[in-house]
Amino acid sequence: MNNTISPGEVLKVIKERIENFDNQVKSDSVGEVISIKDGIALIYGLEKAKFGEVVVFANGITGIVLGLDCDTASVVVFGDERSVGEGDTAKCTGKLMDVPVGLELLGRVVDALGNPIDGAGSIDSKTRLPVEIKAPGIIARQSVTEPLQTGIKIIDMLIPIGRGQRELIIGDRKTGKTAIAIDTIINQKAHNDVVSEKEKVYCIYVAIGQKNSSVARIVDKLRVSGALEYTIVVAAGASDTVSFQYLAPYAACAMGEFFRDNGMHCLIVYDDLSKHAVAYRQMSLLLRRPPGREAYPGDVFFLHSRLLERAAKMSDKEGGGSLTALPIIETQAGDVSAYVPTNVISITDGQIFLESEIFYKGLRPAVNVGLSVSRVGSAAQTKSVKKVAGSVKLSLAQYRELEDFAKFGSDIDVHSQKVLDRGRRMMELLKQKQYSPLSVPEQVAVIFAGTSGCLDGVSVSDISRFEEMLLKELNENYPDVLSSILNNFTDDVKDLLLEIIGKVTSNFE
C-alpha cells in the first residue's frame, strides 16, 4: 500500500489554504485608565475616540466620552466607579449610546440605560434607538391640531394643551407640579380604553433626582389606577450617579420617539429639569469646563433645547404621530427670572405657573391663570370647549382686579358686586381634587353652569356639593346629553343643560 503524498496534492492544499486565508486585521482603540474620581475616568491612549462614543471597561461597565484632549479622553462612567481602577483597560466600541425601545417596555420601571429595576424580569425588546438624535425639521412637522386632555378643568378650559406641544409646569416646591402631570397620565386611561392601538396616548414618566420612596409611591398610584399598563417609568433617583441623572431624559425621549415615529401618540413628563441642570452642572465642573452664570456651563440652554425640540406633531407624510412634553421646573421663592427657568420658558410653547400663595389659600390646582399661557394649544380645543371657556379668562381677570380694590373696603356698585360674586363661584368651580380627572363634556357642563349665571343663587360653600350632584345627575340620567356636548354644543343642548342645572340648583334654594 503506497502512503506517499504527491507534490501535486501538497501544492493543491497550499493553494486552497492561501485562497481561503482571512488576512483581515481587527483594529481596536484601547486605552488605559490613569485616574478616576467622582464618576469621571481619565483615559490615556484612546486616540480614535469620538465625542459621545460609548467606552467599555475591562469589567464590562460602560461610559461615554464627554471630553477630548490631545492625548487623554474624559469618560463619564455609568455604574459603580469603585469597580474601575487605575491601570484598567478601556476600549472604544465605535457606537453611540442607545437604549431599548418598544411596546415591551410598557408597564415597566427602568433605569437610564433601559435596564429593568422593578424586579419583574428582563425586557425582551427587539429595537434599540440612540439617546441623542437630531430633532425633526420644519418640513417633517405640522401644526398642533389635536387636543391632549389633562382631565383638569382649569387647564383644559383656560390653558389647553395639544398633541405635540411642549408645555412647562413651573412653580415652587410642594405646589402640585407632579400632581398635575400624574393626573394627566391617569386621565389618558378613559381615552385609551375606547380607541385603537394607533390612537392610544402612551405615557413616559421620567424621575430625575427624585427620592426613591416618591417614585415608588407614583408607580403604585399608576398601577392602582390602571395607568401603568400604558406607561413607562424611567427613574434616575437621588442616590444614582449624576451620569444617570444626566442621561435619563434623553433615554426616555428616545423611547417616546419610537411611538412618535411609528404614527402613535406619546406624552412624556420630565420631573424635573431643574435637577437635570444641576446634575449637568456638577458633571461639567468635574470635566473642568469653564463655569458661567450661576456656575452653569455655557451650553446649558442647548442641554434642554435639544431635548425639548424632539417633541413634535409629525406631518401626515411622516406618519402623523406626536410626542408631547410636559417638562417640570422648580423655582425658588417664585423667582421665574432665574437662569434655568427663563431658558426653559423660552424653549417651550407655554407654561402653567403654580403659586404657593394660591396653594395655601386652598385653591388647588394652584394655577395662576394670569401668568399661565398656552401659545398653540387653543388651536386644538374642541368647539364646545371654545364656546364655554372663551369668556372665563376675562371674567377671572376682572374678578381679581375688583377683589384687590374691594380689600380697601370702599363702596362697590351693583355691577361690580355681581362680578365679584360670580368670580368667587367660578374660582370654587375650578377647584379639583387630585386623582379625579373629568371628561371634556363633564368639564363643559360644570363651567357652563358658572358662566350662565345659574349659580348666582347658590352659596359659595355649596358649590362643590352642587358640582358633585350635577355630575351624578348627568352620568346617571342624561348620558346622551354628555355625548351631545362632546359632538356639538347646540342651542338645543344648551337649553336642555340649563334645565338640568336648574333642577339641581333647586336643591340649594
Curated annotation (Swiss-Prot):
Cleaved signal peptide residues: none
Keyword Translocase: yes
Oligomer and partners: F-type ATPases have 2 components, CF(1) - the catalytic core - and CF(0) - the membrane proton channel. CF(1) has five subunits: alpha(3), beta(3), gamma(1), delta(1), epsilon(1). CF(0) has three main subunits: a(1), b(2) and c(9-12). The alpha and beta chains form an alternating ring which encloses part of the gamma chain. CF(1) is attached to CF(0) by a central stalk formed by the gamma and epsilon chains, while a peripheral stalk is formed by the delta and b chains.
Major site of localization recorded for this protein: membrane
E.C. numbers: 7.1.2.2
A GO cellular component entry from the record: proton-transporting ATP synthase complex
PROSITE patterns for the chain: ATPASE_ALPHA_BETA (PS00152)
Organism (species): Ehrlichia chaffeensis (strain ATCC CRL-10679 / Arkansas)
Function recorded in the entry: Produces ATP from ADP in the presence of a proton gradient across the membrane. The alpha chain is a regulatory subunit.
SUPFAM superfamilies documented for this protein: C-terminal domain of alpha and beta subunits of F1 ATP synthase, N-terminal domain of alpha and beta subunits of F1 ATP synthase, P-loop containing nucleoside triphosphate hydrolases
Positions of ATP binding: 171-178
Locations listed in the record: Cell inner membrane
Pfam families: ATP-synt_ab (PF00006), ATP-synt_ab_C (PF00306), ATP-synt_ab_N (PF02874)
Transmembrane segments: none
NCBIfam families per UniProt: atpA, PRK13343.1
Site-annotated residues for Required for activity: 372
UniProt KW Cell membrane keyword: yes
PANTHER family: ATP SYNTHASE SUBUNIT ALPHA, MITOCHONDRIAL
Reactions that this protein is recorded to catalyse: ATP + H2O + 4 H(+)(in) = ADP + phosphate + 5 H(+)(out)
Bilayer topology: Peripheral membrane protein
An annotated Gene Ontology molecular function: proton-transporting ATP synthase activity, rotational mechanism
Family to which this protein belongs: Belongs to the ATPase alpha/beta chains family.
Protein name: ATP synthase subunit alpha
Keywords for the protein's UniProt record, in alphabetical order: ATP synthesis, ATP-binding, Cell inner membrane, Cell membrane, CF(1), Hydrogen ion transport, Ion transport, Membrane, Nucleotide-binding, Translocase, Transport
